[in-house]
């Protein structure tokens, strides 16, 4: 059975004002094309439990992996802009590998708050591997993107990187959140190139934010001792650091109200997600109009 690890495990305290009283809670926007960003949100919420969270999933344009780059940039900027007009946002987390690699410069030019992106956890995986073989499990777009190749060259040059690009796992993760069972035989078939390798990877990077939602199933299918590494806790630590050190917490707007989710189009599938979103701590939902 595989073991799930993350890029670190430290937890920072909630920010306090200089007089020792609790600070106004920051409003944090987490954005993804689908529900994969919930894996990032969950890690951030454990680190900053008192923050006010907004989660947007772009179910109208999901998935982003096969979309043209300029479409994604324009789309992400428009969505963050629409949320900016409705809420007093202190921090934006782009919880999508595809969107992060191409849209962060445009977002940082337009919005005067810290913006965090997600990249595959190749650097920690290269440190953790015992046999020097690291698997990168991601969407085809992430596997093919030059940004990913640069990460491998920079941080894992002495490792053998086995890349596996798949869109099917994204659909499986979405279905799992709807309460559907993940068919393990199908998962084994998708991972067959690694499972049949003479020496499979002993460390696997979950290079899409959807994939930690399937960690239990991946652990059941991959060889005993395989380590799963994702970026969730690293993003959470970065968010906590920014809240503590890069924001004047006394000037936060302190937006009130329940944590809220937004979709871009109301569908039966989006409505069916509400029980799961409630379990994640969201108290209301709405539709975002661009």
Curated annotation (Swiss-Prot):
Q: What does this gene product do?
A: Provides the (R)-glutamate required for cell wall biosynthesis.
In short, the EC number is 5.1.1.3
> Which PROSITE patterns does the UniProt record give?
ASP_GLU_RACEMASE_1, ASP_GLU_RACEMASE_2
Which classification does the entry list for the species?
Bacteria, Pseudomonadati, Pseudomonadota, Gammaproteobacteria, Enterobacterales
Assigned protein family: Belongs to the aspartate/glutamate racemases family.
Per its UniProt record, what Gene3D superfamilies does this chain match?
Answer: 3.40.50.1860
The residues forming a coiled coil are none
Keywords, comma-separated and alphabetical:
Cell shape, Cell wall biogenesis/degradation, Isomerase, Peptidoglycan synthesis
Q: What HAMAP family does UniProt report for this protein, alphabetically?
A: Glu_racemase
Task: Please name the catalytic residues of this protein.
Answer: 96, 208
Biological or metabolic pathway of the protein? Cell wall biogenesis; peptidoglycan biosynthesis
What GO terms are given for molecular function?
glutamate racemase activity
Q: Where does substrate bind?
A: 32-33, 64-65, 97-98, 209-210
Matching InterPro entries, A to Z? Asp/Glu/hydantoin_racemase, Asp/Glu_race, Asp/Glu_racemase_AS_1, Asp/Glu_racemase_AS_2, Glu_race
Per its record, the protein catalyses: L-glutamate = D-glutamate
User: For this chain's UniProt record, which GO biological process terms are given?
Assistant: cell wall organization; peptidoglycan biosynthetic process; regulation of cell shape
Q: What is this protein called?
A: Glutamate racemase
